[in-house]
């Protein structure tokens, strides 16, 4: 409203000046400077009587209609960049706040069993000190699926998987998603799972993987973030594979030392 009143006052004064000097050329009026004016925003409505009587004024008004900056694109880009930086900072703050506010969900016993079955294992209970589950190596292997990963295992092997939520150290597990069984004499392939095959394991420890650095950068936004991540892992020891005929181990009889010494003596005498 202030700019509108100012413009009306200027138009009124201009009419008095132009009425006295009507014989001036159009080029002489381009040098007139209007002091004490500050037109910043808003649309200005010119005086109709002035534009009707002075046709050159409309042409001069159109030529003077411009923004008070060297380039309109510069201001737009600066505003967009500042808004982008603010948005990035807000996103980073929201991410940190959400990480701090994260709360572990409580599962019921039935939900724990269902979740474990979807991953591919079943908790059989804690390992007792009197139990002897670890056996010597047997020439049998199996391919099991735990979560989204597959492992080729034999008894006595140790594997690292993504952390299994519902088991503790020294718990006995039964891996139910067996995809393949094999030995020296036969191979059994599941479609996709072998229902009668099981692989037994024991939880040895819950550990953390090596730190992975994650660097994020956005061009022209002055946005740089470096974060570290350590994946939680579970170490399993395979104890037994069931569902396939195991070949009998070949027993190799070693000759006694007395027989070896007698044989060497006979060779020397001969």
UniProtKB/Swiss-Prot annotation:
Listed Basic and acidic residues bias regions: 102-113
Disordered, as annotated region: 68-113
Tissue occurrence: Constitutively expressed in roots, stems, leaves, flowers, pistils and siliques.
Domain of life: Eukaryota
Coiled coil, from the record: none
Disruption phenotype: Failure of fusion of the polar nuclei during megagametogenesis and abnormal double fertilization; fails to undergo fusion of the outer nuclear membranes.
Ranges of compositional bias, category Acidic residues: 75-101
InterPro entries reported for this sequence: bL21-like, bL21-like_sf, Ribosomal_bL21, Ribosomal_bL21_CS
UniProt entry keywords in alphabetical sequence: Developmental protein, Fertilization, Karyogamy, Mitochondrion, Ribonucleoprotein, Ribosomal protein, RNA-binding, rRNA-binding, Transit peptide
Pfam families per the UniProt record, alphabetical: Ribosomal_L21p
Transit peptide (first-last residue): 1-68
GO molecular-function terms, A-Z: rRNA binding; structural constituent of ribosome; transcription cis-regulatory region binding
Location(s) in or outside the cell: Mitochondrion
Biological process annotations from GO: double fertilization forming a zygote and endosperm; embryo sac development; karyogamy; polar nucleus fusion; pollen development; translation
A Gene Ontology cellular-component term: ribosome
HAMAP family: Ribosomal_bL21
Family membership noted in the UniProt record: Belongs to the bacterial ribosomal protein bL21 family.
Function: This protein binds to 23S ribosomal RNA in the presence of protein L20. Required for karyogamy during female gametophyte development, when the two polar nuclei fuse to form the diploid central cell nucleus, and during double fertilization of the egg cell and the central cell.
Subunit field text: Component of the mitochondrial ribosome large subunit.
Name of the featured protein: Large ribosomal subunit protein bL21m
UniProt source species: Arabidopsis thaliana (Mouse-ear cress)
């Amino acid at each position: 409203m202030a700019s509108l009143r100012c413009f009306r006052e200027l138009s009124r004064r201009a009419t008095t000046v132009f009425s006295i000097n009507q014989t001036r050329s159009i080029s002489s009026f381009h040098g007139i400077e209007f002091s004490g004016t500050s037109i910043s925003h808003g649309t200005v409505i010119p005086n109709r009587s002035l534009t009707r009587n002075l046709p050159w004024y409309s042409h001069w008004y159109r030529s003077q209609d411009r923004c008070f900056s060297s380039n309109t694109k510069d201001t737009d880009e600066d505003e967009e960049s500042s808004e982008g930086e603010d948005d990035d900072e807000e996103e980073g703050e929201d991410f940190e706040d959400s990480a701090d506010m994260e709360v572990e969900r409580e599962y019921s016993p039935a939900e724990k069993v269902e979740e474990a079955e979807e991953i591919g294992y079943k908790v059989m209970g804690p390992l007792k000190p009197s139990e002897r589950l670890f056996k010597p190596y047997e020439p049998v292997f199996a391919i099991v699926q735990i979560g989204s990963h597959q492992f080729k295992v034999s008894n006595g092997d140790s594997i690292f998987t993504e952390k299994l939520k519902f088991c503790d150290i020294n718990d006995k597990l039964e891996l139910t998603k067996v995809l393949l069984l094999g030995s020296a004499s036969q191979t059994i392939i599941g479609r996709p799972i072998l229902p009668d095959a099981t692989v037994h394991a024991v939880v040895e420890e819950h550990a953390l993987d090596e730190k992975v650095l994650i660097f994020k950068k956005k061009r022209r936004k002055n946005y740089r973030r470096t974060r570290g991540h350590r994946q939680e892992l579970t170490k399993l020891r395979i104890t037994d594979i069931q569902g396939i005929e195991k070949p009998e181990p070949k027993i190799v009889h070693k000759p006694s030392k007395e027989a070896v010494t007698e044989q060497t003596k006979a060779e020397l005498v001969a």
